[in-house]
Amino acid sequence: MKKTTKRVLAFLLASTFVFSAMTAGVFAIASYLNPNLGSSSTSTYMSVNSVDDFIDLIKTSGNAFANIDEPEKHNAANEDVAPTIIIPGISQSVSYLADENGNPAVNSNGEELSGGLLIIDSSTLPGILAGTVAGPLVTSLIMQADMGLSDAVYETVTQVFSIQASDKDGKAKENLKTITYEYPISQMSQDDRDYFYRMIPMKSVVDEIGGEDNLYFFTFPLISDPMITAAKLDKYIQMVKEQTGKDKVNIVTVSLGGTILTAYLELYKNTNYPDINKVLNVVSCLDGTDVMGDFYMRNFNIEDEFFFQEFLPMVMKEMNGYATLGHLINVALKIFPRSVIEAILTAAVDGILDTLMLNCPQFWAMIPKDRYDDVINKYSFIKNDPEYSRLYATIEKFQQARLNLKDNLIKLNKQGALVHNVCGYNLDYSAQDYCFFAAMKSSLTTNSDAIIDIDSTSLGATYAKAGEVLSEEYIATRDPKYISPDGSVDASTCLFPDNVWFFQGQHHEVGRNDVIIKLIAKLASNQINSTADMPDKFPQFNGNRNTRNITRWCFDDADRVFAEYAEDPTLYNAEDIEELRAVYEEAEVYLENTICEPTSAKALLERFEYALYRVGVGDAPADTSTDEALEIICKFVDETIYGVFGADGFSDLNDSKVVIDVPVTF
């Protein structure tokens, strides 16, 4: 059941932001029937914000909700470094449904109802699908028309996400609590410390920023008001100052954490921010993301070839390494007329918006400021209906904070606080993980880290769409030192052009890149204060690499083998040990080089993993020939059928069929 739950949650993560309800239904049913779906070792769901990591955490952290005694005051290990507060990204703060006593509620299977992103009662999924969808599904299939299926999809979506629904005031309907840490990392339980380093992989550099006594983790709920969270952040800052004896703190925002910084700076703009030493924004949501703007505006890429042929194979390939299931689903969807598919897609989007997004201020905080007016006008009932007056006032307040952000940051900077930004760029939303965001139409024009657009994370970079370059006429008028080597980004238009670092081709999951973690440590510890410092090691424009498995697994596995070999040399072949030592040393040297390049990191990992396999660690390289052949066959069948029917269903070729017209709004 654990593997089933993992795949169901992975599906639900996707369906939250993807507008395909039929895809959602198929994924859920397939995941329930096949516990191994998507569990291939080639899956890219890992590192920060990962569903797989979160499920592993829940399975291994039995005392995630354990109480810890309040720590005594202490002095930081490094008196020259201000304490650092991490404001994490989406899914990195764990919330739970609480019972009447404030304890985590459990479902009928005895599982805690908790999560970093979605809180889903997986025990109810089979019953919901059977009781709500099954009947209309069969009837609609027989009649080749929407016989209540879209209504059933809407009801299913609202039931699945009901735990995190918000009311018309913008407040959570259920009793949701968030695990908080009123003490430094050094005072955490071992399970919580392990969780922190899984989410924020700073273990290798923690001494550089003053040690674990100097590092704090400010968690906050997703279903919330960012202005209220910002007020809690201020109290947290005062607590950290008292515990450490320091006058100021460093703030590190990650992804969604940027919205909390935005709210904080607006809420306390009249104080001149006396508590802030410096701010580090790491792929931070400082001006929303077009992913959210598109979803609210229902601005999806529904071009026939993309949506009805390319999209699902791309998503399934990301999940388990092969596009086979995506091609099969494409073919299976042909059993319905196109009008039915469009009706249930619309219903799914309606359900997600009505349950999760429209009444939740934190989701509104992820809309770019220049798209806010269009969104609020689309849902004009929120500003016109008195029942929504509190919600409207709340989201208007944050919109003003967003409009004032640059002025507030300039004010902060004038008080002597540096503001640094670290960004990934030159990707559209189809790149690497979470490629279901490619369904958003802005994917065709964005330059991003595959989640957040570069003008948001960098505070104003000018860009060409991913894969293209700025015009020669534009570049000729700009300072060349701020133009990226690939010609796609101009950093001179950023709010702080000498305090922003760009990693070309870097995905939003920056925890996989050891160089970015090292850069954060240099910035927090005052070793780097601008792009003019250490440009040979940390240039303003760098590449990307994924060293996560090397730093997280390979070194530890090798150390264990070396220790066993030292104790009993007969356990391993001497030549295999020699090769493992050689690749170990090569990896150490490689990681000292902070100029990023992706292919060399991949080659090093493959060599390291093979050396470990030779000494019995890990699995043998799998024979993929059958999977590859099956993928080719299914792709051929899918493309052949699409060539005949296009985006239409099989029955759409029958002119005598009954058609129920449905307005398409997804």
Regions found by a protein language model. Give the residues of each.
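Positively charged n-region of N-terminal signal peptides that target proteins for export
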Residues: 1-7
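Sec-dependent N-terminal signal peptides of Gram-positive bacterial secreted proteins and lipoproteins
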Residues: 7-27
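Short, solvent-exposed loop/turn elements at domain surfaces
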Residues: 21, 93-97, 429-433, 647-649
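N-terminal non-catalytic accessory region
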Residues: 29-252, 259-312, 428, 438, ...
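Alpha/beta-hydrolase fold catalytic core
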Residues: 213-227, 349-437, 465
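The feature captures the conserved acid-bearing segment of alpha/beta-hydrolase catalytic domains
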Residues: 300-313, 407-414, 419
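Alpha/beta-hydrolase-fold enzymes
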Residues: 303-389
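Beta-rich interaction/scaffold domains
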Residues: 547-647, 651-660
